[in-house]
Regions:
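Acidic, glycine-enriched loop/beta-strand segments at the rims
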Residues: 1-11, 24-27, 296, 324, ...
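Histidine-rich, glycine-flanked metal-binding segment
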Residues: 4-45
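Divalent metal-coordination and catalytic microenvironments
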Residues: 12, 17, 41, 49-52, ...
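Metal-associated gating/positioning segment near the N- to mid-region
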Residues: 39-99, 115-121, 147, 174-180, ...
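Divalent metal-dependent hydrolysis catalytic cores, especially in the metallo-beta-lactamase
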Residues: 67-87, 102-111, 131-144, 161-164, ...
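Surface-exposed amphipathic alpha-helices with a cationic face
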Residues: 92-96, 149-160, 230, 302-306, ...
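Metal-dependent enolase-superfamily TIM-barrel catalytic cores that perform enediolate-based chemistry
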Residues: 116-168
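Active-site neighborhoods of metal-dependent hydrolases
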Residues: 126, 133-136, 144, 195-339, ...
Length: 417
């Protein structure tokens, strides 16, 4: 995905999980005993990433395996876990060794929030402990005061671990930018930064991700925000699918609950999602027309990020309200194009951009020497972004997950739930 191009009549040779050769079908030679996967008329692209994933934060590995399967079945070959748990370190190791099937796993530690950080000193000690334990980064949730946040950020820089996630209301977007987030997720703090006098409001009044004050935004402030984000090299994980499917009035909760992908989730979970959306729509502050304008404002912010070279990463927040792991990544890609990105620009957010962000050149490209994380598609996603859903198979390093195998495993999940 380093260029917007299609290379016709290609053969890709994989050995021990790596691409060892690729080129014109008439010229590339390979062992006659090799397993041949017929991709005639199909399109091979790098595996996708879900950069705002949730792996169950529990002691039991079995629920984790189900979520990993859903990601892999949807062509997701890298995930960034945004709600860490001690057993996730073990899970990461078992995925790396091949003991457990799953995408490449980058994980945060347990959340830094208003409840988990009772003091500045406790927050600093949490940072040191998570760095020592081996987590890849720190996850920020709402509730931190600016003093506790400052202590956390200072210690994180001292010990060499990045932090990402929400922007606590008391911290605000400008302190967050100055502190040097690795990623800001959900466009958190963006709308507040556009609202004059936002300091006189409360988090509860504004609603989740400021959904109730979108009409107060002064869009002439957007260029200042974009410049600051670009200059500080702070990447964005919009999770627009969460807003479009949960907040938007035009998507009926019962209809969403009956979408085909919901059959792979526990019914209690889907019922909770349904009630969560219905309760939001009953909120006295909820105004359908205003929320539709808020959704359009979020799309504009995504478009402006892309236009102004603020790095974008693919992340939908799954599982979360009506976001089934893996499936929600395809929704997110579509919403990125709805925001004005081309299919190629949207695909970059889940491929080559991820490699740049993680400083791993093996992620997001198809070339000799890189890890074979690949997806075979029925059609060309550069002309129709919805083609990412039409998966013929997934190469997960040295494992080929055929369409037949994927369908069989998904059927098992369906029968369970």
């Amino acid at each position: 995905m380093d260029e917007e191009r299609v290379l016709p009549n290609q053969v890709v040779v994989i050995k021990n999980g790596k691409i060892v050769a690729m080129g014109d079908a008439q010229k590339i030679k390979y062992n006659k005993k090799a397993v041949v996967i017929d991709g005639k008329g199909k399109y091979l692209m790098p595996g996708l990433a879900e950069m705002h994933a949730h792996v169950p934060p529990v002691d039991d590995l079995e629920p984790m395996k189900e979520v990993l399967l859903l990601f892999a079945a949807n062509g997701v070959t890298t995930i960034r876990g945004m709600l860490g748990h001690p057993r996730h370190l073990e899970l990461r190791s078992k995925i790396q060794s091949g003991e457990i099937l799953g995408p490449r796993f980058v994980t945060s530690g347990p959340s830094f929030n208003g409840n988990s950080v009772p003091s500045e000193e406790a927050g600093a000690e949490m940072v040191r402990q998570q760095r020592k334990a081996g987590y890849d980064f720190l996850k920020i949730h709402p509730g931190l005061t600016k003093e506790k946040f400052a202590a956390m950020a200072k210690t994180a820089k001292e010990v060499g671990i990045s932090f990402a996630g929400h922007v606590p209301f008391d911290v605000g977007i400008w302190r967050a930018i100055d502190a040097g987030y690795a990623t800001i997720d959900h466009l958190d703090g963006f709308v507040e930064s556009l609202v004059p006098g936002v300091e006189n409001t409360t988090e509860q009044q504004n609603g989740l991700f400021a959904m109730f004050i979108g009409d107060m935004a002064d869009t002439t402030r957007i260029p200042k925000l974009m410049t600051a984000l670009r200059d500080k090299n702070i990447w964005q994980v919009p999770t627009q699918a969460l807003a479009e499917r949960w907040f938007a009035p035009g998507k009926d909760a019962d209809a969403l609950a009956n979408e085909p992908e919901m059959k792979y989730m526990d019914r209690k979970t889907v019922t909770n999602w349904t009630n969560t959306k219905k309760n939001l729509l009953k909120n006295a502050k909820y105004n359908a027309e205003a929320i539709n304008r808020y959704i359009l404002l979020r799309r504009k912010l995504i478009y402006e990020c892309n236009k102004n070279n603020v790095g974008l990463l693919l992340g939908s927040d799954g599982p979360q309200v009506f976001n089934v792991p893996g499936f929600s990544v395809h929704h997110e890609l579509k919403y990125l194009t709805d925001a004005g990105l081309t299919p190629y620009q949207a695909l970059r957010t889940g491929t080559v951009n991820v490699g740049k962000f993680l400083n791993n050149p093996e992620i997001g490209t198809i070339k000799k020497g890189v890890v074979a994380d690949l997806v075979l598609l029925r059609g060309n996603p550069l002309t129709n972004i919805n083609e990412t859903k039409n998966i013929e198979g997934v190469m997960l390093r040295n494992l080929w997950l055929s369409k037949k195998w994927i369908e069989k495993e998904l059927k098992k999940l369906e029968e369970k739930y």
